[in-house]
Amino acid sequence: MTSTDSAQTPTGAPAKAPAKDPWDLPDVSGLVVGVLGGTGPQGKGLAYRLAKAGQKVIIGSRAADRARAAAEELGHGVEGADNAETARRSDIVIVAVPWEGHGKTLESLREELAGKLVVDCVNPLGFDKKGAYALKPEEGSAAQQAAALLPDSRVTAAFHHLSAVLLQDPEIDEIDTDVMVLGEERADVEIVQALAGRIPGMRGIFAGRLRNAHQVESLVANLISVNRRYKAHAGLRVTDV
């Protein structure tokens, strides 16, 4: 039997390649991670956890001196810079800016973010006396807005459901939660899954394409309600995976 014969089924049709193991994820330990909005609670917490896990991290802010002060506070080799420098020097850029400044920030960094793997973790929310509620951006979601504003970037969405309180608490060794990761290209999604898995206790789980990002972002409003009722810092676990 020739090698050509062995690559065919008994009917003569080409044999299917074996399915890829969904947990066979790339090594991302050598990639530089930038965090836009790295001086805010969520960005600062993510920067701390990733740096503590051994990732090279740069936190960005509109004011470089504020970013450097926050980086010094975090330790673990974290550096601080303005947003533009952070974007230029990073392989992966996490967007953790407030929703109100999301579009303007990304539009101003379009050139610096070209070719970069962008991870949007912004949750468009409103608040009133009844609590948190989801907003619906014109583009459909914060992640889709990012994709529209950054046509030359590889946009994904992840890290929406993490408690900033737990992320920043040095007494907590593991963050017991799954991270839902969305994106258009499997290779990009798997890099973000692997990045999430660098943080002890976390798993990155593929959760669909960017068109599904709205409900993932919106779920944070429900988690805020859970946290207020039960005095908790709730996360998510996906079962049977």
Predicted feature residues:
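NAD(P)+-binding Rossmann beta1-loop-alpha1 motif at the extreme N-terminus of oxidoreductases
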Residues: 2-69, 73, 198
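Phosphate-coordination loops involved in phosphoryl transfer and adenosine-cofactor binding
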Residues: 29-32, 115, 176
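Hydrophobic Val/Ile/Leu positions in short beta-strands of Rossmann-like dinucleotide-binding domains
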Residues: 35-36, 95, 181
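Rossmann-like NAD(P)-binding element
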Residues: 75-78, 83-117, 121-130
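General beta-strand structural signal in soluble alpha/beta enzymes
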Residues: 80, 154-159, 204-207
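Rossmann-fold NAD(P)-binding glycine/threonine-rich loop
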Residues: 122-165, 169-171
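Active-site-lining helix/loop region of Rossmann-like oxidoreductase modules
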Residues: 177-241
